[in-house]
Design a protein with these regions (language model features):
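N-terminal amphipathic/basic-hydrophobic helices that include classical n-h-c signal peptides
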Residues: 1-20
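A generic structured-segment signal
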Residues: 3, 33-35
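Cys/His-rich Zn2+-binding cysteine-cluster or related metal-binding knuckle/ribbon modules and their
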Residues: 22-24, 29, 33, 43-108, ...
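Solvent-exposed alpha-helical segments within well-ordered globular domains of core cellular machineries
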Residues: 25-29, 43-47, 58, 62, ...
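Extended interfacial segments that mediate partner engagement and assembly in macromolecular machines
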Residues: 42, 91-160
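Glycine-rich, flexible loop/turn motifs
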Residues: 60, 73, 85, 107, ...
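Long C-terminal interaction/binding lobes of large macromolecular proteins
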Residues: 118, 145-157, 161-217
C-alpha cells in the first residue's frame, strides 16, 4: 500500500486554522468575563460578530477603546464622565445641600431617570464586605467625609442596595456622621430585599426617594 502524502501547503492551512480557533476561544473567554454573560451567551455573541459586517466589529472595537480613553471618574463625586467635573456636579441649579450616596456609577443613571432627585451624588465604588475583604478604606468614604466637611451639606441619602452588604455600609455611614449637623436618611421600603437598584422600575425608586426614612437628625 502506498503511503498517503500530505498535500502541499496543508501544514500552513492547519496552523492558520488553529490560530483562528485560538483567537475565537480567546474572544469567547473575554466575553464570558462580562457580568451576566456565561459561556453559552459568550459563544453566541462571538459567532454573531463573525457573521456581521467587518465595519461593525471595527466600530465596536474603536468604541471600546475610545470609552476607556475618554471616560473617567469625576474627581468630585466619582461618577463616570467625559468632562470633569461631571454635568451634575457642574450644574449650579442642583441642590447642593443634599448628597445621595450610591454603590456604583450606573446607580446614578437609574436615579436620574426618575427625574425625582435634584441633589448631588457620591459613588462609593462598592460596599463594605468583610467576606470579600472590602473595608471602608477600600471605598471612597474618606472623600465623602471631606465633601461634608467643606460645609453646606444638610442631608445624606443612603441609596445603597437592600442587601446585607448594602445595609452594613449604610449603618457604617450613619455612625460616621452621627453627632454632626448632617442628617442621614435611607430609601423607603419598596425595593426588593437582596435586589439591585439598577433593576428597580422608575416609579418604585421615585416613591422610595419621596418616602425615605430619616435615620439621624
Amino acid at each position: 500500500m502506498s503511503s498517503l502524502r500530505r498535500p502541499a501547503g496543508s501544514t500552513f492551512r492547519r496552523v492558520s486554522w488553529e490560530c483562528s480557533v485560538n483567537a475565537l476561544d480567546q474572544l469567547i473567554g473575554q466575553l464570558s468575563r462580562l457580568p451576566g454573560i456565561g459561556k453559552k451567551s459568550a459563544t453566541r455573541i462571538a459567532y454573531h460578530l463573525l457573521r456581521t459586517d467587518p465595519s461593525f466589529t471595527r466600530g465596536l472595537a474603536a468604541s471600546l477603546t475610545e470609552v476607556r480613553e475618554r471616560i473617567h471618574p469625576c474627581t468630585v463625586c466619582g461618577n463616570y464622565t467625559e468632562a470633569d467635573p461631571c454635568d451634575v456636579c457642574a450644574d449650579s441649579a442642583r441642590d447642593r445641600t443634599t448628597i445621595c450616596v450610591v454603590e456604583q456609577p450606573q446607580d446614578v443613571a437609574v436615579l436620574e431617570a426618575t427625574r425625582e432627585y435634584r441633589g448631588l451624588y457620591h459613588v462609593l465604588m462598592g460596599v463594605i464586605s468583610p467576606i470579600e475583604g472590602v473595608g471602608p478604606k477600600d471605598l471612597t468614604i474618606s472623600r465623602l467625609g471631606a465633601r461634608v466637611k467643606e460645609g453646606g451639606v444638610k442631608e445624606i441619602i443612603l441609596a445603597t442596595n437592600p442587601t446585607v452588604e448594602g445595609d452594613t455600609t449604610a449603618l457604617y455611614l450613619v455612625k460616621l456622621f452621627e453627632g454632626s449637623e448632617v442628617r442621614t436618611s435611607r430609601l423607603a421600603l419598596g425595593l426588593p430585599v437582596g435586589g439591585d437598584l439598577e433593576y428597580a422600575d422608575r416609579l418604585t425608586i421615585a416613591r422610595s426617594l419621596r418616602g425615605r426614612t430619616l435615620l439621624s437628625s
